[in-house]
Each structure stands twice: as structure tokens, then as C-alpha cells.
Amino acid sequence: DHRDLHSFPTRRSSDLIIFFDIDGTLLRLRAKELSEKTVEALNRLKANGIRLCIATGRTPVSLPHFSGIEFDTFLTFNGSLCYNDTETIFSNPISPDDVQKLIRNADSLGRPVSVATKSRLAANGFDIDLSDYYSIAHLQLTVAKDFEQVSNEEVYQLLLGCRETDYSAILKDVDGAKIAAWWDRAVDIIPANGGKGIGIQKVLEYYHLDKSEALAFGDGNNDIEMLLSVGTGVAMGNASPQLKEVADEICKDVAEDGIYDYCLTHGLI
């Protein structure tokens, strides 16, 4: 299903959209700001009328505000909440019943969890894996006094420290949620019918765009669905082997300004 990739930039730019993962794709891991070349590429894409969409497992609360560039659209919680400046495009929270089961399952493993709503990230305890997971997004893990209240609001995602061997215990008796992992010490738990793929589908419908008018850049296993949901899926040079397998193209490493280089060589900027 490898299309003629050179057909992508020749359309009217206003009919194009590019989805970007954040960590390891736009941003070098643990960096706070985008490289100058990445900012330049994004601004030139935007000047050419191309829509720019952040597509991340992060919560709206932990979205970075990069200096020098504004994105049009945000696909957060691995696709469960998509919005732009004016409205919500798609909202798909986890059922309250499953949220409570997941909290109990984590508790039986001796693991604290963090619940993420549109406006809050609240944890019921502290452990080093969860704390380190927070720090990747430059957040400080603190225990929320109102955890119970927040966990009864619309929860889009749960975060907890665990290993792959714990996955089945965490999901015990849970029908409507699944694990989306991009790090070996912690997981995001999202709706079973969620994922970046469904989010992208909803964003494309909203803007009346076809799959062939969309491009995506990613680096982790949680980007596999995203790359398969667009006309042209590009894996970063630093991407996981599994992602490179499904990608239409592979660009340079994030540390070598892979996005800038790809956009330049493909005539997008």
C-alpha cells in the first residue's frame, strides 16, 4: 500500500494536514524546546497553508507550549480527546466503572495511579516509576488530596508505573480499556476503542480531508496505528524497529532535524 509519495506535496496546501508525535519526534527526549530547524520547518509548513496537528499520549495539561510556533489542532490522550481553538472535535472517555476497576487492580499490585481529565492530572500515591514518567513531561508527581473526586469525573487516561508482566493483572475484569505503552517502566491506559488511529480519523472527517491528504511523523510503538491511518507515514531515524516496519518512509533522527530534512527534500517547505 505504498502510494506515490511525491503526489503528497503537489496538491493544494490547504488540503493537507501533518500529525506530529511529541517526545522523540518533534522533541529530543527530555529536551524542553524544539530545535531552531524544527521551528523553521513548522512555520514554513504553516505559511504554505498546511495544517499542523500535535498527536500525543500526553494530557492537555502536560502539552508543551513551544515558543515560536502555534499548532492548529491537538490530538491528546492517544486520540481520546481531539480539539482545536474553537471546539472539541472528538471526546471518548473511559467508562467510570472501568476507571474504578483499574484503580483497584493497580492497588492490588501495590501501584499508585494517576487519572487524567481534561483539566487535571491527579495521583493517589507516589512511586519512582510514575514519578520518572511524570518527569519526562517535565511534571512533578504530587499526591492529590481530591483524587477520589477527580477520579469520578470524565477520565480519559490512567497512568501507572508497571512492567509488561503486570499488564494482564492491571486489565483484570476490565472490558473497555487497553494499554498503550511507549516506555518500558510505565503505561497509559486508554479506552479499548481508542488510539491515535481513531483520533486521526475524526480529525480528518472534521476538516473534510482524505487519508491520502495526511502525513504523520512518529517514533514509538504507540505511533504504529497513526502511521497506518494516514496516506504517508514517516518514522524517525530513532524510531522503534516495529514502527520502521510499518512506515512508508524513514527520515533522519530527531537529533539530526529529521522533520526539517524530510520536508525540505520532499518540497513541502
Which residues does each PLM region occupy?
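Short, small-residue-biased leader/transition segments that mark boundaries at the very start
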Residues: 1-13
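Short, structured coil segments at secondary-structure junctions
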Residues: 69-70, 78, 173-176, 229-230, ...
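Asp-based, Mg2+/Mn2+-dependent phosphohydrolase catalytic module
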Residues: 150, 229, 234-269
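Conserved acidic, metal-coordinating active-site core of Asp-based
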Residues: 105, 109-229, 238
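Residue-level signal for inorganic ion chemistry
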Residues: 45, 78, 158, 200, ...
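Asp-based phosphoryl-transfer active-site loop
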Residues: 14-31
